[in-house]
Amino acid sequence: VKYLLLPQTDTRILPFYLAMEEYAARIIKDDDIFFMWQVNPTVIFGRNQLIANEVNIPYCREHGIATYRRKSGGGCVFADMSNIMMSYITCSDNVELTFSRYTSAVVEVLKKLGLNASDNGRNDILIDDRKVSGNAFYHLPGRSIVHGTMLFDTDMAHMQGAITPSTEKLASKGVKSVRSRITTLSEHLAGKMNIEQFKDFVKSEMCDGDILLTDSDIAQIEEITQTYLTPEFIYGSNPRCTNTFQKRVDGVGEFQISIELDHNIIKDINIAGDFFVLGSIDESIIAPLKGVSYTRETLTEALKDLDASTVIASMTTEQLINTILN
């Protein structure tokens, strides 16, 4: 595993680092890649989430907290300079294997610091059964990206104020608030190590060499960054709804379904949520459903060739149809 270095260490906006992942995944083929980064206060929401459902926009504006969408699925997270973001790029196509390989490696690093670390089998890393790291998955041809948080310390007031998880999501985890289900490394390290020392330790344990990006690399990364900054990408689009509902599917995630119907014919549909995406929802699910009747029989026929688990991680086609039908 090689550590990816920038020629300058200035803090950049969050989409730059997401673009850096994409660039590395496309250009560097011979090595697995790892790097860490930090940003000024920012909320990052998943590829298929509705910003109005997940982010307290007035709070973010009032406190100067940036908001950006990423291209991976999963839920909404808050990051600041006390929260280390980690990126891992590998050639594996298997989502479960990629997650497992990465989270297991990070858990082992934390255990070497004497911490009671574990992973929860999906995408979180825990210390004493409380979340210290959440991760998401993004697939490019021939390469997979896992990226996520590592809560060294953070502004809990901003984290709670900026993000608005549904009560159903919290209830599914058996907790009453964001604060009660997370922890920070600083709580457990008790002053033994500062954030820079921790980053140095992680790098030494995870990597066996460096790759230094050039000014030409940076220019190309900045071009990719622009794709994250369009209003269309950040805010997305919703059909004019005649039917909107929310549903949680155990082991898969939370869904917000918006459907535009005309005499019970599906004119448009939007599937949002914090689930993990492995394929194209637009091509594999939405396109086949446009123009069909909103009934179980016609949905089943329209999706008869679909294996939903190849598009949405851990979901069966029957679960998908049940979710769309509410």
Model regions: which residues?
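Phosphate/diphosphate-binding glycine-rich loops and adjacent basic-rich segments that engage nucleotide
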Residues: 138, 142-144, 148-181
